[in-house]
């Protein structure tokens, strides 16, 4: 009897949206994460679920009963946890050593809050750098969810055939990536990367997701038509899409991963309207999208798909395809046909990147010169795990060598180092302050007459405010 084709649904959760007031985080936990987990529990569905460590931490603080439900589903095997950086930072835009630390911190958070350490990894915004497979492997991951659209656009043949090029400013390609599917639909040499696990040269297993499937499902969840089409995406269209992919799986592989998108679209509108229509509408209630997500799962199973998870498809697919072609993916690209530099070039990134970099370098040098202290470890963790505003506050309160220099003033009201949200320094969906290497100083530690480090004073001077 032939095996059923497998299908992976992986909502990915990130509570640190820049336009989400921290006071509303519990609301998101209750109106998005809770109904998703209850749907899985009550329907006996199997899915993967990715969340940043900070998202899990907020769940524990703001909605512990929602976290308890997640923990129960993870431990019972209904949900496979998928790990990522502790905060939703684009790894392609920061130094590898910082990325490695935050990846391990994210894994620690999953283990702390659910009792399970993920084997599969997620790369925020699918921002690409060639060192990422080594980074994830060193952090302890066995597999990584990859962006197929970036991979396919690295083939000149596909770029020429589709006429697509990377958008260096935003997500304008998101609704046009179906052109990739139109080109590869009868080409098994390309399809096989979407329907089989593959392995990076270092042995890291990879599974690929694509907007050609995720985008129609997203529009279906939202039930939206605003200016893009006359009617919402229908259940029949979703069914036809899954039927087409079922025949492609039969010809080329064993599974597909059609939904690896924001979990917050289940139960809320999240960023849908600002991304698609540039409308200032954020996190509106969308309770009908919960029922539509259930319909996606039910449609898949009615067509003969088996709901599965990343680790299961890898375990059951046989030897992975050896895939050294990932080395031709251009550094700096991201999902939706965009680029990581679109995030790195935002106003807040350019403003705060040098501040973050100088603070990091100063603390790292102090660690080296003092032989390491717990307070310094805590300061580094604060900087790489929360945001520049909180990092400044934490470091300023440290005893000993990290006391605030007497001739450095405190930030005054109105300065744009905000403490309203812990996503201000490191933007969640799109990092506002990222270490892109724009600041360099051979010795970031400057000492005055008091022999106290002038790291923070120098940081403020660089912004023209000291």
Language model region names:
Residues 2-31, 166, 180-181, 194-212, ...:
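Active-site and substrate-binding clefts of carbohydrate-active enzymes
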Residues 33, 37, 67-71, 100-110, ...:
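Generic structural signal for well-ordered alpha-helices
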Residues 19-21, 58-63, 93-95, 128-137, ...:
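A short acidic (Asp/Glu
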């Amino acid at each position: 009897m032939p095996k059923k084709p497998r299908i992976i649904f992986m909502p990915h959760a990130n509570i640190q949206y820049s336009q989400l007031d921290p006071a509303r985080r519990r609301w998101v936990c209750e109106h998005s994460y809770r109904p998703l987990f209850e749907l899985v529990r009550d329907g006996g569905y199997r899915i993967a679920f990715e969340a940043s460590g900070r998202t899990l931490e907020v769940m524990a603080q703001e909605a512990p009963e929602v976290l308890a439900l997640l923990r129960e589903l993870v431990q019972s095997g209904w949900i496979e946890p998928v790990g990522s950086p502790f905060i939703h930072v684009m790894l392609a835009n920061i130094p590898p050593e910082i990325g490695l630390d935050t990846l391990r911190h994210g894994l620690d958070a999953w283990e702390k809050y659910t009792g399970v350490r993920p084997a599969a990894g997620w790369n925020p915004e699918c921002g690409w750098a060639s060192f990422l497979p080594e980074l994830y492997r060193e952090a302890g991951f066995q597999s990584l969810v990859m962006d197929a659209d970036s991979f396919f656009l690295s083939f000149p043949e596909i770029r020429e055939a589709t006429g697509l090029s990377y958008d260096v400013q935003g997500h304008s390609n998101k609704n046009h990536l179906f052109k990739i599917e139109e080109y590869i639909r009868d080409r098994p040499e390309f399809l096989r990367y979407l329907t089989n696990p593959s392995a990076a040269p270092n042995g890291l297993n990879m599974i690929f997701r694509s907007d050609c499937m995720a985008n129609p499902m997203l529009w279906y969840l939202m039930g939206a038509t605003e200016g893009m089409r006359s009617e919402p995406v229908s259940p029949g269209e979703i069914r036809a899409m899954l039927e087409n992919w079922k025949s492609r799986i039969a010809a080329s592989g064993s599974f597909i991963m059609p939904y690896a998108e924001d979990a917050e679209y289940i139960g809320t509108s999240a960023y849908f309207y600002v991304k698609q229509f540039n409308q200032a509408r954020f996190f509106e209630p969308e309770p009908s999208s919960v029922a539509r997500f259930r319909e996606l799962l039910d449609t898949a199973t009615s067509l003969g798909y088996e709901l599965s998870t990343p680790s299961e498809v890898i375990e059951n697919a046989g030897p992975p395809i050896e895939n050294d072609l990932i080395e031709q993916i251009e550094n700096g690209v991201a999902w939706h046909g965009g680029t990581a530099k679109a995030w790195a070039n935002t106003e807040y990134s350019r403003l705060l990147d040098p501040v973050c970099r100088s603070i990091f370098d100063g603390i790292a040098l102090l660690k080296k010169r003092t032989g390491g202290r717990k307070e310094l470890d805590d300061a580094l963790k604060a900087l790489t795990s929360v945001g520049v505003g909180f990092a400044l506050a934490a470091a300023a309160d440290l005893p000993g060598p990290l006391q605030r220099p007497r001739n450095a003033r405190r930030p005054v009201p109105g300065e744009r180092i905000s403490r309203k949200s812990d996503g201000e320094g490191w933007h969640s969906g799109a990092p506002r302050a990222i270490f892109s290497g724009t600041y360099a100083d051979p010795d970031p530690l400057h000492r005055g007459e008091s022999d106290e480090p002038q790291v923070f004073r120098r940081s403020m001077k660089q912004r023209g405010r000291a």
